[in-house]
Amino acid sequence: LMSGAVKMGMDFRLIGPKQYWPAGPFYEECLKVAKETGIRISFIDSYTEEKVQDLTVATDNLEAGEKLGKFAATLLGPDDQIAIVAHVKGVSTAVEREEGFRKGLGDLAKNIVEVVYCDSQYEKSRKLTQELMEKYPNLKMVAGMNEYSSVGAARAVKAAGAKDRIQVVGVDSSQEAVQLMENGVFKGLVVQKAFKMGYIGVKETILMLRGKSYEKDINSGCELVTPDNMYDSEIEKLLFPFNTLKLS
């Protein structure tokens, strides 16, 4: 798609990079060429190590991970084992959320027994979590780093009848994630402001293309959602953005 944009002479591209490190054809053949030919680049949600973009709108993933880690620490004992189910190895969101999660856990980070990657596939996350529960019979927490990994992990814990023994926390939400929280499987989710992220990304890109002043690095924010606050009005707007959207 990016190489096609270069050939067609497009003015800009909105991109959500899948890999943090720039190695490989995606950077060499696409982003670098686009930059050299004058195509403006806006990164949404994630970014690359090489700073080729003109603007970025994303959650501060270190902050999101740390927020999740601090909450997780309140649920754990000093020796409780923790496993992380992340999404795609090397993508900026996975790298930074895990780093933030470890920071938020503080001394409890030493109890992380393993980190696995589900490649943003529900079924792979479920199977990996099932294997983790079998491998570590004393496991007390599974932390997902995106919606796929979080929901897949929660499915496995629910299927095993282990929701009271193994705490599940994660990042991102969906209708199923909300239902899993209502059913007592999820103890906490850090939810991104995805609607805001996309809206601001398009808005600031238009300002940039019109030669007007625009923000180059925007943190779209996130919130901790628990069974105790999930029906607060502001939290409902994050969980059900289109149900609560008012059009004028």
Residue ranges of each PLM-predicted region?
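Structural recognition of the beta-strand scaffold that forms the well-ordered cores
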Residues: R40-F43, A58, Q81-V85, E114, ...
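Extracytoplasmic ligand-binding site segments that recognize negatively charged/polar headgroups
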Residues: D60-N61, I84-F101, Y117-K124
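Hydrophobic alpha-helical segments within soluble ligand-binding/sensing domains
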Residues: V57-I82, E96, K124-R126, S174-A177, ...
